[in-house]
């Protein structure tokens, strides 16, 4: 059991997770060393609204001045992370919640001054993750990082991809509420970068699936070898540890 698997669960999925999801994590843990990265967008937006803080978005990124970053940190590292950890432990999965600033885990470069405290992963200090896993814990990571002793928000997809690349993980699993990419009603089990572009052009990939496949493509560029898009509300793992969904790699042809 030397291979790592990184599981990314978006904030919108956290409330939808059922017993099946946690059973799948148990199956993965029998085969691999598991790291989980989570988002928290809906809970962050709700808390910002409660605080009467208006939020602007540019190119899909939340403009994050200091007052917004304080709320992001409070939600991601506090309530969202701890509720997820408690849910895992309720299902007999030992977990430890961390943020990217713990142990200098996620170091970032600011994206731009215009959008404030938003960073892209520049370095991953994997020692903390490996130490926790060696003690049989699942690290559960809130996607914030550090730069010059300041805390920055990180897109959860790119945080997960950065961690997966740094660990040379066998696979990055993106948890969604759909079975994967569908073509004429049938699941596309394998695809690659060039084919995804074609499927978007043909209108096969539309709506909410587009950002999911874009996250997969970005992960490939960061060095991740294999990304699976799976339905977290269903059984998404075989007993062998293989995923049931759409797998995105380089140079694989389907359809």
UniProtKB/Swiss-Prot annotation:
Top-level taxonomic group: Bacteria
Pfam families for the chain: AA_kinase
Subcellular compartments: Cytoplasm
Catalysed transformations (reactions): N-acetyl-L-glutamate + ATP = N-acetyl-L-glutamyl 5-phosphate + ADP
GO biological process, one term: L-arginine biosynthetic process
Family stated for the protein in its record: Belongs to the acetylglutamate kinase family. ArgB subfamily.
HAMAP family attached to this UniProt entry: ArgB (MF_00082)
Its job: Catalyzes the ATP-dependent phosphorylation of N-acetyl-L-glutamate.
Protein name, entry field: Acetylglutamate kinase
Organism phylogeny: Bacteria, Bacillati, Bacillota, Bacilli, Bacillales
Gene: argB
């Amino acid at each position: 059991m030397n291979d790592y698997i990184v599981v990314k669960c978006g904030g919108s999925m956290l409330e939808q997770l059922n017993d099946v999801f946690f059973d799948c994590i148990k199956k993965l843990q029998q085969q691999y060393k598991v790291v989980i990265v989570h988002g928290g967008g809906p809970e962050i937006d709700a808390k910002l609204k409660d605080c009467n803080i208006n939020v602007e978005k540019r190119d899909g990124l939340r403009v994050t001045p200091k007052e917004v970053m304080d709320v992001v940190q409070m939600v991601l590292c506090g309530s969202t992370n701890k509720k997820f950890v408690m849910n895992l432990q309720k299902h007999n999965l030992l977990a430890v919640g961390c943020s990217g600033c713990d142990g200098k885990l996620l170091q970032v470069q600011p994206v731009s001054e215009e959008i404030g405290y938003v960073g892209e992963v520049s370095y991953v200090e994997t020692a903390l993750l490996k130490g926790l896993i060696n003690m049989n814990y699942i690290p559960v990571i809130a996607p914030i990082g550090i730069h010059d002793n300041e805390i920055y928000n990180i897109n959860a997809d790119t945080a997960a991809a950065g961690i997966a690349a740094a660990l040379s993980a066998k696979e990055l699993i993106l948890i969604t509420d759909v079975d994967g990419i569908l073509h004429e009603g049938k699941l596309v089990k394998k695809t690659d970068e060039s084919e995804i572009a074609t499927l978007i052009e043909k209108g096969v990939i539309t709506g909410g699936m587009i950002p999911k496949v874009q996250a997969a493509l970005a992960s490939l560029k960061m060095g991740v070898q294999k990304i699976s898009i799976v339905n977290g509300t269903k059984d998404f793992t075989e007993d062998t540890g293989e995923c049931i969904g759409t797998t995105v790699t380089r140079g694989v042809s389907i359809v």
